[in-house]
Amino acid sequence: MSPKARTAGPAGESTGAPGAPEVPTAPPRPDTPNAPAAGADRASRAGADRPERPGRTGAGRSGAPVRKGGAPPRAGGGPLRYAVVVAGLLLALAAAATASLALGSVRIPPGQVLDALTGRSGPSPFRTIVLDVRLPRVLLGAVVGAGLAVVGAVLQALVRNRLADPFLLGISSGASAGAVLVLVLGGGVGLVGGVTTTLALPAGAFVGALLSLVLVYGLARTGGTLTSTRLVLAGVAVSYILSALATLLLVVAGRPEQFQEAMYWSLGGLGSARWDTLALPAAVLAVGVGALLTLARPLDLLLVGEEEATVLGLDTARFRAAVFVLASLVTAVMVSASGAVGFVGLMAPHAARLAVGAPHRRLLPVAALGGALALVLADLAARTVAAPQDIPVGVLTALTGGPFFLWLMRRRPGPEGAAL
């Protein structure tokens, strides 16, 4: 017996009339009123039915870590995992700081380090080295690393590009060029430590960072739509140009006997760290991170998308401008204390995002701890690899950050970033 043929009725339902040829149901026309709603409903059901592992993030058009389906970013694991990650980073940072206090051109036994820190030892060369030379350097490295890492995490959200950081966007190079100009106009490049104790060097660095950011934005907008990829490319170009200009200023205006010291600082170094150079970076870090933590939710909205953030009430243009100014201020103060240290703001946020997910309320503290740990370890290597000669710490971060940058590009290739 032959099966009954079914025909489609007006509403797309089969009539079940026997002997009639089977006619497939036609999909609704795209221009009918119900088509968009139906498509959105199907997309919503598909996104809701698709299981997603905690912390799993996708890459948007610009590579920004956002959840599939346009939902806000999810935390990687629960509170226990977050606590374990923070505790582990604190322990690792304490161990790295202890090793940095003990190791160097002069090796100090751990017991002597502990006695110097607790005040149980009297005046001695070991106590002077620990308290007056190495401890300020370790603390400054932790502060600068934390500041650059937090700024890097924020910039990656602002431009929605995983390759963004203060160095690659030209902010660090602009701050360095502004600081070098202050040094040259201030009467010589040998006053790095002294000038840092005033507001002149950070102010010059801040102006240089802002001007660099404006220049990068202007170049990225030239000849087309502003996208995150064009922004990063313009930032890399401006970074190299400003670094060359800063070096030229040092060569032309610097006295030969002071040129090496200034070049060491411009390449990124913590050799000028003293107790009086630590207060301003530490204060700016505390205020800056506290302010950015209050902006965690708007930063999360930017990861979802420009249109979605606007619909939810965020003035994205004004928000970006304000956060860019804050990020430039933090970067300028860090650069004025340590020189241009690259790639810490690129590597630490990615490691933190893998550990605790994309929400910025959890990401920023972990990125700060990761950046502090990275720079303390890099400075330890800089002081011990070729002891008693110090290697500029920026050289070591570039040696590790460059391959990481290439790996990141190879790991997640994608089209040009979304329009900003």
Where are these regions (language model features)?
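Alpha-helical transmembrane segments in inner-membrane proteins
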Residues: 2-17, 21-34, 42-45, 50-420
